[in-house]
Amino acid sequence: MKVLALSPIPEEGAGCRFRVSQYIPYLEEHGFEITVLPFYTPEFFRLVYQRGHFAAKAAAFLQLLVKRFGVLRQIDRYDLVWLYREAIPIGPPVIERAIVRRGVPIVFDFDDAIFLRNVSEANRIVSSLKNTRRVAEIVGFSRHVMAGNSFLGDYARRFSANVTVVPTTVDTTRFRPRADRDTMPPDGPVVGWIGSPTTYHYVEAIAPLLKALALRHRFTLKISGAGKPVHFDGVPVIDVPWSMANEVELFNTCDVGVYPLEDDDWARGKCGFKAIQFMACGVPVVASAVGVNREIIRDGENGFLASSPAEWTTKLERLLSDADLRRRFSIAGRHTIEQHYSLHGTAPEIAAILRNAAHRS
């Protein structure tokens, strides 16, 4: 069975990597032939969120646009299109409409509230060109929809009866605790945040309480993916470049993970993935009590949820000062991921969805 997977982003983007690419070995073992065609090249993906370079971005985007329309010349070779988010990052769903008109079914997969407009300093121009209304149309004409959490699933069910909630998962044989998890660095615990330029503002929001904690506790703040130099007065900061090659190591070199979000619908559309990655590596997490975080984390059992600066401060303080608590959360968090957020559990479900969608008229 031949499947064309379309994604706006390459594997350097977590969504393509963990919603699509990580399943390819399993799917190929079970009779699928998967071709992944991202819209952005890795080079353009690195360029697009940088400041300036407007002429270079526009010229490259037009070239990518022409290349994307070329997909339609070969669409009849495939039994199914697996659409992650969108075929083209902006504008109406012209590629998707053309695919459906050619009689090739689509399975639509989304893991963010892309039906809402989300604007940050890092994506202001790209966001202004987004067409949020297209999501409902794509959901409506897709053969099946895979939604990353129940909030997204509820939205999709307004336009389709064929919706399955499929959480974002990790390969638990790859994301696993380091052997010396209980060994403490000489400068105290490492508190880690790993994200992207579009999510860095969330960690900036908890900067004041991190500064206050640094007056009472010895720790180092590790930041990766901010997209700009990071400095918090009074807080020792290690700013580490992100790369696919060192991704697991980045999580594993943290002793406490932080996953702050705002309490809004955009955050409710998130799939808790950074919490999942930390917990898979046995890193105890403090996360905002928003959306799917409430399902992943059982407060006080396998991690902490925080709803206010005071709760963030209290719960981070407990983890910084209590090695036994960190150890308990490490074990319980890892168990949660093994049981509910491992690709070994979701891979057969995704295979069944793709196969059934291709064969259902």
Residue ranges and their predicted role:
Residues 79, 143, 251-270, 283-284:
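Acidic donor-binding loop of glycosyltransferase active sites
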Residues 11-26, 36, 171-177, 182-253:
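Conserved catalytic-core segment of nucleotide-activated headgroup transferases in glycan assembly
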Residues 318, 325-340, 346-352:
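A short, well-ordered alpha-helix in the C-terminal region of glycosyltransferases
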Residues 151, 169:
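Carbohydrate-associated surface elements
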Residues 298-310, 318-324:
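Conserved acidic donor-binding segment of nucleotide-sugar-dependent glycosyltransferases
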Residues 137-140, 244-255, 280, 298:
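Short acidic alpha-helix that forms the nucleotide-activated donor recognition element
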Residues 65-78, 90-108, 114-116, 125-145:
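Membrane-proximal helix-turn-helix segments that form the acceptor-binding/catalytic region
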Residues 277-280, 284-287:
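Short hydrophobic beta-strand element within catalytic cores of glycosyltransferases
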